[in-house]
Amino acid sequence: MCVGLAYKAVWVIAASGSILLTFADFKWDSRVTHFVMTIIHAALLLSIAGSVVLVLCTLTLVIYRLFFHPLAKYPGPKLAACTELWFVRSWTGGYRPFVMRQVHEKYGDVVRVASNELSFRSSTAHKDICSQAPKGKAPFLKSKVFYNVGPSIKHPDIVFTRDPEDHRVQRKALSHAFNSKGLREAKDTIQEHTRLFVEQISKNAGPGTKGVDVTSVYNWLTFDVIGVLTFGESFESVSSWQSSVWVTLLLNMAKHMTFLPAAERLSIPSFALGAVMPSDVSKNAAYHDKLTEEKISKRIGLIKSNDQQAKLLMLAGSEMTATFLAMVTYLLLKNPVSMQKLQNEVRSAFSSAGEITGDSTNNLSYLQAVVEEGLRMLPPSPIGLPRVCPGATIDGHFVPVGTDVSVDAYVLGHDNRYFPEPDEFRPERWIGDDTGNEKDASRPFSFGPRACLGINLAYLEARIVVAHMVYAYDWELVNKNLDWFKEVRLWTLWEKPELYVRFHLRDV
């Protein structure tokens, strides 16, 4: 505040001098020269004073945060304790999950990752933060530092609402789509579109083909499925074998929204954010809104207030599953022993593709283990989504009220105390009583009252699609040198590299 007043004073003095020189009928003599030089000297002195005050204020803040802040006793990167620039660098660079793993390996189970934020690495902490609050205890509300972003400020959807009661109402309104009846209807939709997908793959299969970029085509499949479940109609990407403009716009918008949490942490006002945002982002958003409204208007019972909810369901119900399918395809291709075990299980269980259903795949233990292991290695929501501590003990540490706290699913899933050799793809760790693995530490969809509503739908679609593809085809990785995990980045959603696979109709 002092700095701002100093600079305002400089501006007033300089402006006054300019006005006098412009509009007054001065005779240029020694008095005028003296007057002008006095103004310049005053401006320079005030500017220097303002800079000194700024430096002193900054140093005072840094010293307080490093040595006297309530969280000063916790280890972590010094830059993170002093400024939000540490978060901005890791977040906008797409490396956030990997950076968080590194800092926990360096500093331990409790790390200070911002001036007022702690990151925990333990399944106990995860339960303490995310579980239903006991009666009479205050809940861990979602933090403004992450959830006051984008259009959800005015109309918070089920993910961004911070009010537990509002969340309960929204969850209840959407739950019909994910109850037993809703899942039965979803099974038919998934199986129908998966059969079409397998058929389209056959047109691009064989030894003389360049392969299929499964990173793209799995997106087409999952968006077509969720399009039917959300809007009552498919985007026809699989049947036309090309991406829908609606889907392309949604994915591009999601990627560009990466900078919103960074802007929130840097306290950049919304009007300034709009000024620096690329013009194509706002134009694409407007066009996407128009397409969304058109689709919603065709579905009886959906009203305009559900526009944002529809977009959320589209992203959560499609992109996360598509990422899993691409990732597990790569892992199976890189681990031929696991691929062989899965092929043996699926192909011995079914005598025809028509027997592959949601219920029948639920009985395949190795298939389920492959799904769980894939979700552990690259969870759909890998980062710690901050909650506000009401003043509570988290895994033995009393945390002051108002502190942001979080647990990263990616970090827990790669902790060798819970999962030995965490970077190795080992579906066997999910079969039987493997005492070397603490399976509850893997929570790819979170848990508690704010857990993902579509978890059962995601597992259902993953099992059906993987089983069909393994049953119908032998797979061949085109780019043998591809290191898929080194190329993935997180920009709101997982940004995945191309993954070309040559499919061969299997010998029956």
Residue ranges and their predicted role:
Residues 1, 491-508:
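C-terminal helix/juxtamembrane-tail motif
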Residues 1-169, 191-200, 221, 273-279, ...:
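N-terminal membrane-proximal hinge/A-helix region immediately C-terminal to the signal-anchor transmembrane segment
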Residues 75, 199-200, 336-338, 431, ...:
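Cytochrome P450 heme-binding "Cys pocket" and the immediately downstream C-terminal segment
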Residues 139-151, 185-323, 341:
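Cytochrome P450 heme-thiolate monooxygenase catalytic core
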Residues 156, 172, 176, 311, ...:
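Cytochrome P450 heme-thiolate "Cys pocket" and heme-binding signature region
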Residues 187, 191, 245-252, 331-380, ...:
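Cytochrome P450 I-helix active-site segment
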Residues 320-333, 465:
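Short, small-residue alpha-helix embedded
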Residues 407-434:
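Conserved cytochrome P450 K-helix/beta-meander segment immediately N-terminal to the heme-binding cysteine loop
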